[in-house]
């Protein structure tokens, strides 16, 4: 019993290496003192604003975000968290996109970021602007009224309301606009005041229809416009490669290199889906003969497969072998659940030697842009915390392997050491169980006394005798099942082909046999009376 207790103690100690201490979630516990310096991630802010604008694209915050992107401004009223605050504090706080903001900046919050929100002074609500537009257009037909006959995606309320009030600033319905654009407010002094508080200058040349005009050499297609085109593409085909790339770039808060919006747009419009409506501006601007320098600076991803090539690769892999991720792309054509680039990449990171992964190997070449970018961990080299163990049917070293269960994957040296000792002691337990069964079988061996006590049944069919059914048969069956389970479990561990885990099994069996093997030669004591 002391030996068994000791083994159980060591197994518990080994398993405890997997416990990880959690951290305070400042979104749900914003009053916790440790949350003072918490910063709500930019990727989450962008996702929340996109959530709001996906539901109501005519909201003022959508226009403000686009204008700030065009001016490449991220401070003051253009700070993304301040833009989110414009909606969640004053306009549409009940929308789902505001859920995290409201929790983070709830009453009693100690998060300093909440006190730095630079909301637009006297910004009218969406419905107040809409009401003023309808009132103005009912009194007088003006340019812009045709865009807001109904409140939908074509009715950009802030732009239309500002256009009407710039034309007729003394109208009573423009009182809200006058307050918003007052010289003492932060809108008038911001980089986005042009077109909202002051007339926007008209460009001398239309570089979309005349991209070969010398004056278009320095023309820059704004990030906001490029993002709008990408959104157009992804609304039609959300499984496209560019949609995944944009998500990854947003998560890393990267807007340069392959993550530049114009470069992401180029990935689709130059190589993948040039015929889609979202590529019309790109194709005009970068047509043959264009002098626009931005077109020559597109940093497209080298050897990026097309959406349909990726899907074909996924189908071929999953037809040969069922792997994690295949269930997302089970149909005969891509769907919204089939995010082809991440799925294809995860399959190839797990089985890089498959022939279907030739495109992935080229795309993730160490000399390519994707491999050397900030988003490489999503598609080429996953971090240890997120990496999928590679199935290698040959002896190998390393710590990243599945051990019996999908959730048992050591990702640190400490976790791997704990796994090694857990397997080692389990192998010792296996030898102990075999020894215990051997001892019991010898103690239960029928003898002369059993025959005299009628504990044996004579059988002409078997030409001998056998014991009656007793509780011993139940114990024998249970011990046999335990022994079989242990032996198969250890066999499966050895079949990971991980050298260290293989020798954990061998070492455990060796030590267990040394400790308990001799007891298998146990002979029950025989007295004179037996």
UniProtKB/Swiss-Prot annotation:
Recorded GO CC terms: cell surface; endocytic vesicle membrane; late endosome; late endosome membrane; macropinosome; phagocytic cup; plasma membrane
One Pfam family linked to the record: Ctr
Domain of life, source organism: Eukaryota
Record localization: Late endosome membrane
TM region positions: 491-511
Signal peptide region: 1-22
UniProt keyword terms in alphabetical order: Endocytosis, Endosome, Membrane, Phagocytosis, Signal, Transmembrane, Transmembrane helix
Bilayer topology: Single-pass membrane protein
Gene Ontology molecular-function annotations: copper ion transmembrane transporter activity; transmembrane transporter binding
Main location: membrane
GO biological process, one term: response to bacterium
Homology family: Belongs to the SLC31A transporter family.
Matching PANTHER family: COPPER TRANSPORT PROTEIN-RELATED (PTHR12483:SF119), SOLUTE CARRIER FAMILY 31 COPPER TRANSPORTERS (PTHR12483)
Entry note about domains: The cytoplasmic domain (residues 431-481) is responsible for the endocytosis and localization of the protein to endocytic compartments.
Protein name as catalogued: Protein P80
Organism listed in the record: Dictyostelium discoideum
Gene: p80
């Amino acid at each position: 019993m002391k030996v068994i207790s000791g083994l159980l103690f060591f197994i518990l100690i080994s398993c405890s290496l997997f416990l990880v201490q959690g951290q305070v979630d400042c979104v749900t516990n914003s009053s916790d003192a440790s949350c003072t310096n918490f910063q709500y991630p930019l990727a989450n802010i962008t996702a929340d604003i996109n959530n709001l604008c996906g539901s109501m694209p005519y909201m003022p915050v959508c226009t403000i975000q686009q204008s700030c992107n065009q001016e490449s401004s991220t401070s003051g009223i253009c700070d993304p968290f301040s833009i989110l605050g414009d909606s969640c504090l004053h306009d549409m706080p009940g929308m789902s996109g505001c859920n995290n903001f409201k929790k983070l900046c709830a009453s009693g919050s100690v998060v300093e970021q909440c006190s730095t929100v630079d909301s637009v002074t006297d910004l009218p609500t969406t419905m107040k602007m809409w009401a003023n537009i309808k009132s103005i257009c009912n009194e007088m037909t003006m340019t812009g009224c045709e865009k807001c006959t109904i409140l939908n995606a074509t009715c950009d309320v802030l732009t239309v309301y500002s256009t009407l009030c710039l034309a007729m600033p003394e109208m009573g319905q423009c009182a809200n606009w006058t307050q918003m654009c007052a010289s003492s407010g932060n809108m008038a002094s911001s980089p986005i005041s042009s077109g909202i508080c002051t007339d926007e200058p008209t460009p001398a040349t239309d570089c979309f229809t005349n991209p070969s005009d010398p004056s278009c050499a320095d023309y820059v297609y704004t990030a906001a416009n490029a993002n709008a085109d990408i959104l157009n593409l992804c609304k039609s085909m959300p499984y496209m490669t560019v949609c995944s790339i944009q998500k990854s770039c947003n998560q890393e808060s990267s807007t340069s290199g392959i993550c530049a919006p114009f470069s992401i747009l180029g990935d689709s419009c130059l190589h993948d889906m040039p015929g889609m409506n979202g590529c019309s501006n790109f194709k005009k601007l970068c047509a043959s003969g264009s002098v626009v320098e931005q077109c020559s600076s597109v940093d497209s991803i080298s050897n990026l497969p097309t959406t349909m090539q990726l899907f074909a690769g996924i189908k071929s892999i999953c037809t040969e072998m069922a792997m994690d991720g295949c269930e997302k792309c089970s149909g005969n054509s891509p769907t919204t659940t089939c995010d082809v680039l991440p799925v294809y990449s995860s399959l190839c990171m797990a089985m890089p030697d498959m022939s279907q992964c030739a495109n992935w190997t080229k795309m993730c070449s160490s000399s390519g842009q994707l491999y050397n970018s900030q988003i490489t961990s999503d598609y080429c080299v996953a971090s240890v915390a997120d990496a999928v163990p590679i199935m290698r049917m040959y002896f190998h070293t390393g710590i990243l392997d599945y051990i019996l269960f999908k959730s048992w994957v050591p990702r640190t040296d400490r976790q791997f050491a704990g796994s090694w000792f857990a397997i080692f002691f389990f192998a010792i337990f296996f030898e102990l169980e075999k020894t215990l069964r051997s001892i019991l079988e010898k103690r239960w061996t029928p003898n002369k006394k059993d025959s005299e006590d009628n504990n044996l049944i004579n059988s002409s069919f078997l030409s001998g005798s056998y014991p009656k059914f007793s509780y011993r048969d139940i114990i024998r069956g249970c011990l046999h099942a335990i022994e079989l389970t242990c032996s198969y479990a250890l066999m499966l561990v050895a079949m990971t082909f991980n050298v260290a885990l293989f020798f954990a099994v061998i070492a455990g069996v060796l030590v267990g046999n040394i400790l308990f093997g001799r007891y298998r030669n146990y002979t029950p004591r025989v007295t004179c009376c037996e």
